[in-house]
């Protein structure tokens, strides 16, 4: 995994074939640029044979949280497991190098199965139908899956902190 700057992401967009993933990458780039996240939280890229094939856009804060915004596989590279490999590398980095303890994420219903395979659980649905979560983050998929199994068996052990639950409620989330 490596960090990439806005120039590299623009190059990837320019050189990618048109399609939904290129459009998604372009939107992620615009968001990152608008929020000035390239300076403090550059996207992490996963490479296959020296070629960037997947990117993760996430931020880290001092409270031990990571906020995951986007995971995008480049157009034409889908179906090779790159997003999963990128995710595996990212969670290891987040926990072991950034000392991340918890993950905040919002995802669309179409991506729930992918996130479920990675051991994530969701606690709220916003008015647009996106699912929201605030949960512990572990350095491996196996540990994340084990945590999810425990959470399913005893949901009280996995409730988000009261501050997160209060935020979900204040935003009118189900």
Protein language model features and the residues they cover:
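A short beta-loop-alpha structural element at the N-terminal edge
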Residues: 1-14
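Active-site rim helix/loop that mediates acceptor-substrate recognition in acyltransferases
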Residues: 20-43, 57
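Short hydrophobic/aromatic beta-strand element in the GNAT-like acyltransferase core
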Residues: 40-45, 55, 70, 104
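Conserved beta-strand in the GNAT
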Residues: 51-59, 67-72
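Residue-level recognition of the GNAT/N-acetyltransferase active site
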Residues: 74, 78, 108
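Conserved acetyl-CoA-binding loop-helix of GNAT-fold acetyltransferases
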Residues: 79-93
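Intrinsically disordered, low-complexity, positively biased terminal segments
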Residues: 92, 98-100, 147, 153-174
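Conserved active-site alpha-helix within GNAT-family acetyltransferase domains
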Residues: 99, 108-132
């Amino acid at each position: 995994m490596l960090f990439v700057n806005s120039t590299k992401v623009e190059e990837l967009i320019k050189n990618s074939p048109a399609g939904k993933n290129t459009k998604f990458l372009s939107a992620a780039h615009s968001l990152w640029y608008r929020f000035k996240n390239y300076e403090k939280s550059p996207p992490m890229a996963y490479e296959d044979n020296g070629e960037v094939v997947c990117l993760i856009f996430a931020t880290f804060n001092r409270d031990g949280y990571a906020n995951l915004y986007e995971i995008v596989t480049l157009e034409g590279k889908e179906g090779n497991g790159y997003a999963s490999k990128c995710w595996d590398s990212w969670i290891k980095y987040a926990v072991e190098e950034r000392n991340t303890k918890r993950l905040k994420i919002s995802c669309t219903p179409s991506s729930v199965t992918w996130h479920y395979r990675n051991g994530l659980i969701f606690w709220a649905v916003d008015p647009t139908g996106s699912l929201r979560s605030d949960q512990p983050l572990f350095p491996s998929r196996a540990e994340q899956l084990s945590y999810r199994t425990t959470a399913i068996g005893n949901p009280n052990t996995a409730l988000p902190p009261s501050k997160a639950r209060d935020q979900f409620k204040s935003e009118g989330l189900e």
